[in-house]
């Protein structure tokens, strides 16, 4: 793959998990020979622990060796992993996989990789994949920024989905938000021309932040209404489906009176 950091033209502090140059003069993303980090990482996700149920563990043991991997530094050969050439989509923070499974089942011609750090959530998705016989999902456990930097080649993705990322509402935590300028630039560099970045949030403050960051990225153009385009035109131009199932989380947000803001940007061709 190409040189692994499309964020090189941005300050490293704007990428979640990357310290400022003042606190860490080492090259962003540099690791020790053993693969461990040479500095503490500020991540965009919260640490959570949880044990798998016996049924989840059984499904995990049967399925994970084939459909799952830990995030690493080696470039990913998605065609070999899926056993076919097909449009490649990644979903960052797939959680328990309700939307992941539904959208993959609706698009059997698409190869979909879900990325998540929380094993019990992944285990629920693994169970669903096994139960429903879904064959076009693969899973990566770990940090999505590492995936984008080290495992995904430039201009290889047809789509990137980020549904309801943690808004980190407190001002002092805004640096932890996933969708920062450098991260969006990294995503844009991994999208093929015509590929789409599809984002949804129920947090008004984060929506304003996301809108500004997306509008400032020169490789992206707004397709739907929230990004200055037209919803119907977005559906026509997008190379992947934009319809999401309403998850329990989203339904709870609706009942709490939170508005859902959806963004669709396309990579310039």
Curated annotation (Swiss-Prot):
Active site: 166
Entry-linked Pfam families: Methyltransf_4 (PF02390)
Catalytic activity: guanosine(46) in tRNA + S-adenosyl-L-methionine = N(7)-methylguanosine(46) in tRNA + S-adenosyl-L-homocysteine
PANTHER family linked: 3-DEOXY-D-MANNO-OCTULOSONIC-ACID TRANSFERASE/TRNA GUANINE-N 7 - -METHYLTRANSFERASE (PTHR23417), PENTACOTRIPEPTIDE-REPEAT REGION OF PRORP DOMAIN-CONTAINING PROTEIN (PTHR23417:SF14)
Gene behind the chain: trmB
EC number assigned by the record: 2.1.1.33
Domain of life: Bacteria
MF-aspect GO terms: tRNA (guanine(46)-N7)-methyltransferase activity
Swiss-Prot/TrEMBL keywords: Methyltransferase, S-adenosyl-L-methionine, Transferase, tRNA processing
Coiled coil: none
Sequence similarity: Belongs to the class I-like SAM-binding methyltransferase superfamily. TrmB family.
NCBIfam families, alphabetized: tRNA (guanosine(46)-N7)-methyltransferase TrmB
Binding site residues for S-adenosyl-L-methionine: 91, 116, 143, 166
Binding site for substrate: 170, 202, 247-250
Organism of provenance: Nocardia farcinica (strain IFM 10152)
Name under which the protein is recorded: tRNA (guanine-N(7)-)-methyltransferase
Transmembrane is among the record's keywords: no
GO cellular component entries: tRNA methyltransferase complex
Functional pathway: tRNA modification; N(7)-methylguanine-tRNA biosynthesis
InterPro entries, per database record: SAM-dependent_MTases_sf, tRNA_(Gua-N-7)_MeTrfase_Trmb, tRNA_methyltr_TrmB_bact
Alphabetical list of HAMAP family matching this protein: tRNA_methyltr_TrmB
Role summary: Catalyzes the formation of N(7)-methylguanine at position 46 (m7G46) in tRNA.
């Amino acid at each position: 793959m190409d040189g692994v950091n499309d964020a090189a033209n941005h300050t490293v502090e704007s990428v979640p998990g990357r310290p400022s140059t003042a606190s860490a003069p080492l090259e962003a993303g540099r690791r020790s020979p053993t693969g461990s980090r040479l500095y503490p990482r500020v991540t965009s996700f919260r640490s959570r622990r949880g044990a798998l149920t016996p049924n989840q563990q059984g499904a995990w043991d049967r399925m994970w060796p084939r459909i799952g991997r830990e995030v690493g530094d080696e470039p990913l050969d998605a065609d070999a992993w899926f056993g076919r050439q097909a449009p490649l989509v990644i979903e960052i923070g797939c959680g328990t996989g309700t939307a992941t499974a539904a959208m993959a089942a609706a698009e059997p011609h698409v190869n979909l990789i879900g990325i998540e750090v929380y094993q019990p959530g992944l285990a629920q998705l693994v169970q669903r994949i096994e139960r429903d016989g879904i064959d076009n999902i693969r899973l990566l456990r770990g940090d999505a920024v590492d995936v984008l930097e080290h495992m995904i080649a430039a201009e290889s993705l047809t789509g990137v989905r980020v549904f309801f990322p943690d808004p980190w509402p407190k001002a002092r935590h805004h640096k932890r938000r996933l969708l920062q300028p450098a991260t969006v630039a990294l995503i844009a560099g991994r999208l093929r021309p015509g590929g789409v970045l599809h984002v949804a949030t129920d947090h008004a403050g984060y929506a304003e932040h996301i809108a500004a960051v997306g509008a400032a990225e020169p490789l992206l153009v707004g397709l739907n209404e929230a990004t200055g385009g037209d919803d119907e035109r977005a559906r026509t131009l997008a190379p992947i489906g934009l319809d999401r199932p309403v998850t329990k989380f989203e339904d709870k947000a609706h009942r709490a009176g939170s508005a859902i803001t959806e963004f669709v940007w396309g990579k310039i061709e």
